[in-house]
Amino acid sequence: MKKPIYKVLYVQVIVAIIIGIALGHFYPALATDMKPLGDAFIKLIKMVIGPIIFCTVVTGIAGMEDMKKVGRVGGKALLYFEIVSTFALILGLAATHLLRPGVGFNVDPATLNGKEVASYAAKAHGQTTVDFLMHIIPDTLVSAFSQGEILQILLIALLFGAVLAHVGERGKPVTNFIESLSSILFGMVGIITKLAPIGAFGAMAFTIGKYGIGSLLPMLKLIGTFYLTSIVFVVVVLGFIAKMVGFNILRFVAYIKEEMLIVLGTSSSEAALPQLMLKLEKLGCSRSVVGLVVPTGYSFNLDGTNIYMTMAVLFIAQATNTDLTWGQQLTLLAVTMLTSKGASGVTGAGFITLAATLAVVPTIPLSGMVLILGIDRFMSECRALTNIVGNGVATVVVSAWEKELDRSKLRAALSRDVSVTESAEV
């Protein structure tokens, strides 16, 4: 029997977002007090992200007959990430050249107050590429889970799953236990997801209440350019990839609409990570591929962040009348390919990564970040939405490459609506 419309999750989230915007606009002081509601929802999701990734990866790998497959899946995923990320970076650069959102500002860098972005710059300087790679190795097994470090948890799960596969029947009781634990955790996700409207309301009310809709007006051209470029990337680039694999990108976006609305409300792609993994399994992707590709993608396949990075850097250059040679722009692309890998699905991570990029490209004034500081929160939503679609498509593509995509499930799932709570029950 079809649910009444008021009980449908994505409808509840849409209504909550609209109410949050209205409260933030008309009662900003009260709206900023709603922040704990959004924070609490994200914390609840983060509470189960680590264990879910661990269980999904371990059970997926433990069931593999050929351990070489782990390296093969990982290699294909990283190859896909690099190719598509490069397209995203180039598209961001090309769109900014074409639409020129920063031209006409004529800002003197000497008049900008760099103190406002000093904290972001300090965080950006704090980690080199070697530090990032070393950080993947946890201090202890417990610390990876207690600190919610996705890549560290993924490393532990890979080793744990490989050992379980190696010991064979002796490890079967442990595998069965982890599979049962996984079912319980996804059941928890189904319960937590029902609170998504409250979380989306709180986060959106705080954003509008603190920054105000009026703060968007001077920068509408940049915001519009970013949103338009992201839509073009999803529809054209990801749409072409999806067509090559055998599915429609618009149907896929409709399939994950609940997760996208949660991301829109909370401005964090991590807020929908467990639900996305569940939906991708229901779509016909194998558990082992989902477990490997999705968590890795949250650090290495942030398409929305990549578009934002090149666009923001070039916008600052245009606004401050800083001329960049083609050689410098190619250097910018190379640097951004590295710095963007340090970003995560957390709100504000893109801005810290931008600071890291500008620190390596000294021609552009770091203080220019002040120009977009006030609107970054509004651009964060688009980054997160593009990231979640990109990671979803990547998982389907790698599953297809591995011949572990159930085409009948794919067709059935994209032809009807499957909610997270339904998936959890299954």
Curated annotation (Swiss-Prot):
What cellular component GO annotations does this protein have?
plasma membrane
Q: Which GO terms describe its molecular function?
A: fumarate transmembrane transporter activity; malate:proton symporter activity; succinate transmembrane transporter activity
The transmembrane residues are 8-28, 44-64, 78-98, 148-168, 184-204, 222-242, 297-317, 355-375
- The answer, when asked if Transmembrane helix is one of the entry's keywords, is yes
| Pfam families to which the protein is assigned, alphabetical | SDF (PF00375)
What PROSITE patterns does this protein's entry cite?
Answer: NA_DICARBOXYL_SYMP_1 (PS00713), NA_DICARBOXYL_SYMP_2 (PS00714)
Alphabetized, the UniProt keywords read:
Cell inner membrane, Cell membrane, Membrane, Symport, Transmembrane, Transmembrane helix, Transport
* Topology relative to the membrane: Multi-pass membrane protein
Q: Where does this one sit in the cell?
A: Cell inner membrane
Identify the InterPro entries for this entry.
C4_dicarb_transport, Na-dicarboxylate_symporter, Na-dicarboxylate_symporter_CS, Na:dicarbo_symporter_sf
Picking any one GO biological process from the record gives: L-aspartate transmembrane transport
Q: What is its main location?
A: membrane
To which protein family does this belong? Belongs to the dicarboxylate/amino acid:cation symporter (DAACS) (TC 2.A.23) family.
Its biological purpose: Responsible for the transport of dicarboxylates such as succinate, fumarate, and malate from the periplasm across the membrane.
HAMAP family documented for this protein: C4_dicarb_transport
Supply the name of the protein: C4-dicarboxylate transport protein
**Gene name on record?**
dctA
